[in-house]
Curated annotation (Swiss-Prot):
The lineage of its organism: Viruses, Duplodnaviria, Heunggongvirae, Peploviricota, Herviviricetes. Residues 152-163, 219-238 have a biased composition (Pro residues). The keyword Metal-binding does not apply. GO terms for biological process: symbiont-mediated perturbation of host natural killer cell mediated immune response. Residues 126-145 have a biased composition (Low complexity). Keywords: Host cell membrane, Host Golgi apparatus, Host membrane, Host-virus interaction, Membrane, Modulation of host NK-cell activity by virus, Signal, Viral immunoevasion. Interacts with host components of the WAVE2 complex ABI1, NAP1 and WAVE2. Also interacts with host ABI2 and TLN1. This is Protein UL135. Remodels the host actin cytoskeleton in order to impair immune recognition of infected cells. Mechanistically, interacts with members of the host WAVE2 complex and redirects the complex to the plasma membrane. In turn, the efficiency of immune synapse formation is greatly reduced. Residues 105-274 are annotated as: Disordered. Residues 1-22 form the signal peptide. GO terms for cellular component: host cell Golgi apparatus; host cell plasma membrane; membrane.
Length: 308
């Protein structure tokens, strides 16, 4: 331990050194205590010759042998190793007809007792007991007292009714007719309808209505007012005027003049005509002039729209 203490001190851990020292002291003290307990167990007086069932707290140890007070663990171990002797169960059952024992309202028909055989005098008169635990004094009881106990049921007991018959309910009392005069009149009987008589059909009258006031006029149904004329929509933007050159171009591409009217007898094939034969191709100067005119007309339309 000294070398351990020096090694821990050299490491420089003062807290760890104190903890190790405390653990070492605790283990040394506990080892001494266990050695004292094992040495004191053999000094119990009469440990092998005393009676079974005794407790460790019943021993009286001399003062010179007592080193430490008897620990509770020793007593518990003593009780565990030497259990108490089992006690013989006492007889608590009741004898029928035995002198000196009271019989308080025995059950009838008996549930706990059995009817004894009176013909044999040696039969015990109680049930639930073995002859080894109880004395045989009950066999000397007289059979006359047994008969008197069995044949005298308690006054509160009544025999059950036979199963075939049922209890009849009590008849209600008959009331005599009253002779007092009453002011209640019986209802008048409705006459029976006669046969072979046709009753004329009755006309149902409508329920009366309330009289109308003098200046009352029927409500006027509301008439719908004429619809207001919808304002006319503004005119749409006028289309740009088509130029002559563009019209000629479209007509040239779509027109197909025939020299004479077609007859149904002739074939449907048309002669091939070239575009150059019908109209000469346009020049670039003409196209530029047409574009300038179109731009000028568009500008005029835009100025007129802004002015309006």
């Amino acid at each position: 331990m000294v070398w351990l203490w020096l090694g821990v001190g050299l490491l420089g851990g003062t807290g760890l050194a104190s903890l190790v020292l405390a653990i070492s002291l605790f283990t040394q003290r506990r080892g001494r205590k266990r050695s004292d307990e094992t040495s004191s167990r053999g000094r119990l007086p009469g440990a092998a010759s005393d009676k079974r069932g005794a407790c460790a707290c019943c021993y009286r140890i001399p003062k010179e042998d007592v080193v430490e007070p008897l620990d509770l663990e020793l007593g518990l171990m003593r009780v565990a190793t030497h259990p108490p002797t089992p006690q013989v169960p006492r007889c608590t059952s009741l004898y029928i007809g035995e002198d000196g024992l009271p019989i308080d309202k025995p059950e009838f028909p008996p549930a706990r007792f059995e009817i004894p055989d009176v013909s044999t005098p040696g039969t015990p008169t109680s049930i639930g007991r073995s002859p080894s635990h109880c004395s045989s004094s009950s066999s000397l009881s007289s059979s006359a007292s047994v008969d008197t106990v069995l044949h005298q049921p308690p006054p509160s007991w009544k025999p059950p009714p036979p199963p075939g018959r049922k209890k009849r309910p009590p008849t209600p009392p008959v009331r005599a007719p009253t002779t007092r005069l009453s002011s209640h009149r019986p209802p008048t009987p409705i006459p029976a309808p006669r046969k072979n008589l046709s009753t004329p059909p009755t006309k149902k009258t409508p329920p009366p209505t309330k009289p109308k006031p003098v200046g009352w006029t029927p409500p006027v149904t509301p008439r719908p007012f004429p619809k207001t004329p919808t304002p006319q929509k503004p005119p749409r933007n006028p289309r740009l005027p088509r130029t002559v050159g563009l019209e000629n171009l479209s007509k040239v591409g779509l027109s197909c003049p025939c020299p004479r009217p077609r007859t149904p007898t002739e074939p449907t094939t048309l002669p091939i005509v070239s575009v150059s034969e019908l109209a000469p191709p346009p020049r670039w100067s003409d196209i530029e002039e047409l574009l300038e005119k179109a731009v000028q007309s568009v500008m005029k339309d835009a100025e007129s729209m802004q002015m309006t």
